[in-house]
């Protein structure tokens, strides 16, 4: 089944390009470690999900590009065409000459209604090209104006017009030190609106990806392109084909539906994270070998201790003994030592994958008490390697991973709101103080729900 990607704003369009580039590069990789027949099935499954095809055989991304300034979209169109491997559709873009100035209200209340019909028409045409449509993958930031404000508006429209189709938003969490002075306002407005209209929020923290680039990839001068390539690698390792549960020879048809079914059992809990292992530079890779036991041991401890990468894992954190209250029931003011999960999905790719033992992820102590481990954990596999790694593992988790960052953003936004700082920039475009209060209430409930797991 096909997925239509909606790229919103500078951030969404730059990441979207890297995702499509990573997907196609991987599907054409010769390091697959599997037979030609399997490789062809893998390529066909990838193309069905993310690409249509021109008469001349060039893959065209199933994507809609939206921005209020033309510069970034033009760059991405050009880069895709120059790759010679794939390109964007000729009529798949919508851009204007005026940005949103990092103002969420302007993106949501001005650009959204003004351009709603044009944007939704382009999306409709892209959906109509799909023989079998699964849903939308929406890539956006949450701190700026276009990606976040217009992104929330477009997602709401998709929910209204495609209520039976799945919607997953991939959201970039801003740097803690701040790129935009009103980023906390923009963030709470984005998250609270998406919580009402999206089926799942796949969140990536800029700070965590930056550390992966610096410490694991050994990149000295880290650019946004470096960060976006790590993000694209993580997303590709989630969405590339894996075998279905019924067969080791057929790839699953509906990755979005399967992800939602396994990871979002309750609408109160929609926040998903991705952890990927290994991450390393080409130079280090040549001298490193991996075992499934080693990779999965690291990945499990990353989950338990809420580590974003394999370096610097706290190995002193353990699940609570049965019968004892979990440490995570402590108040937010104390450290959340143990990361309780609602649901986890492990995706394994590479050599000898059938021998990998995932029993450690079935431990009932890892999960909330209201879901049985048999329902809370799932594993997907394929012996086809991903990217440059002979063996790789991905953990997609619905857990308490973002409780502290979310609580901090809500707290910072509340402090600004209490002093009425910058509120006039929002009210003049129709976002009233009541809208802020609704957002605070909504997200405080999300924090409380995750804390009480």
Curated annotation (Swiss-Prot):
Transmembrane segments: none
Gene that this polypeptide is encoded by: TUBD1
Name of the protein: Tubulin delta chain
Entry function: Acts as a positive regulator of hedgehog signaling and regulates ciliary function.
Keywords: Cell projection, Cilium biogenesis/degradation, Cytoplasm, Cytoskeleton, Developmental protein, GTP-binding, Microtubule, Nucleotide-binding, Nucleus
Gene Ontology CC: centriole; cilium; cytoplasm; cytosol; microtubule; nucleoplasm
Pfam families membership: Tubulin
InterPro entries assigned: Delta_tubulin, Tub_FtsZ_C, Tubulin, Tubulin/FtsZ_GTPase_sf, Tubulin_C, Tubulin_CS, Tubulin_FtsZ_GTPase
Location of this chain's protein in the cell: Nucleus; Cytoplasm; Cytoplasm, Cytoskeleton, Microtubule organizing center, Centrosome, Centriole; Cell projection, Cilium
GO MF terms, alphabetically ordered: GTP binding; structural constituent of cytoskeleton
Family listed: Belongs to the tubulin family.
Subunit structure: Found in a complex with TEDC1, TEDC2, TUBE1 and TUBD1.
Gene Ontology biological process terms from the UniProt entry: cell projection organization; microtubule cytoskeleton organization; mitotic cell cycle; positive regulation of smoothened signaling pathway
């Amino acid at each position: 089944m096909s997925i239509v990607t909606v790229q919103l704003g500078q951030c969404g369009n730059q990441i979207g390009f890297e995702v499509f580039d990573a997907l196609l590069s991987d599907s054409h990789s010769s390091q697959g470690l599997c037979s030609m027949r399997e490789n062809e099935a893998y390529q066909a499954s990838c193309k069905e999900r993310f690409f249509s095809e021109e008469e001349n055989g060039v893959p065209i991304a199933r994507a809609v590009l939206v921005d209020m300034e033309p510069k970034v979209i033009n760059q991405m169109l050009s880069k895709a065409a120059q790759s010679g491997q794939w390109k964007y559709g000729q009529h798949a873009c919508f851009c204007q000459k005026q940005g949103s100035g990092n103002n969420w209200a302007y993106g949501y209340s001005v650009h959204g209604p003004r351009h709603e019909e044009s944007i939704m028409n382009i999306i409709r045409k892209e959906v109509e090209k799909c023989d079998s449509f699964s849903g939308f993958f929406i890539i956006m930031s949450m701190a700026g104006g276009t990606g976040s404000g217009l992104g929330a508006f477009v997602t709401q429209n998709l929910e209204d017009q495609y209520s039976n189709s799945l919607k997953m938003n991939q959201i970039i969490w801003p740097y803690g030190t701040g790129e935009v002075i009103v980023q906390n306002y923009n963030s709470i407005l984005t998250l609270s609106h998406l919580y009402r209209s999206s089926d799942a929020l796949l969140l990536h923290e800029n700070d965590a990806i930056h550390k992966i680039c610096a410490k694991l990839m050994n990149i000295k001068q880290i650019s946004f392109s470096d960060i976006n390539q790590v993000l694209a690698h993580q997303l590709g390792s989630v969405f590339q084909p894996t075998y279905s549960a019924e067969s080791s020879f057929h790839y699953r048809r509906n990755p979005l539906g399967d992800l939602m079914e396994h990871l979002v059992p309750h609408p109160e809990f929609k926040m998903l994270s991705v952890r990927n292992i290994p991450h390393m530079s080409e130079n280090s890779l040549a001298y490193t070998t991996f075992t499934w036991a080693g990779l999965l041991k690291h990945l499990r401890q990353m989950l338990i201790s809420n580590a974003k990468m394999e370096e610097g894992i706290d190995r002193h954190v353990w699940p609570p003994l049965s019968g004892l209250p979990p440490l995570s029931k402590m108040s937010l003011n104390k450290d959340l030592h143990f990361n309780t999960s609602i649901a986890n999905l492990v995706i394994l790719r590479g050599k000898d994958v059938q021998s990998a033992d995932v029993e450690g992820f079935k431990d009932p102590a890892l999960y909330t008490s209201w879901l049985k481990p048999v329902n809370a954990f799932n594993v997907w596999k394929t012996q086809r390697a991903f990217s440059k790694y002979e063996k790789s593992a991905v953990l997609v988790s619905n857990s308490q991973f973002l409780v502290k960052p979310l609580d901090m953003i809500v707290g910072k936004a509340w402090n600004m709101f209490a002093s009425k700082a910058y509120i006039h920039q929002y009210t003049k475009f129709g976002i009233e103080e009541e809208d802020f209060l609704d957002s605070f209430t909504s997200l405080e409930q999300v924090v409380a729900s995750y804390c009480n797991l």
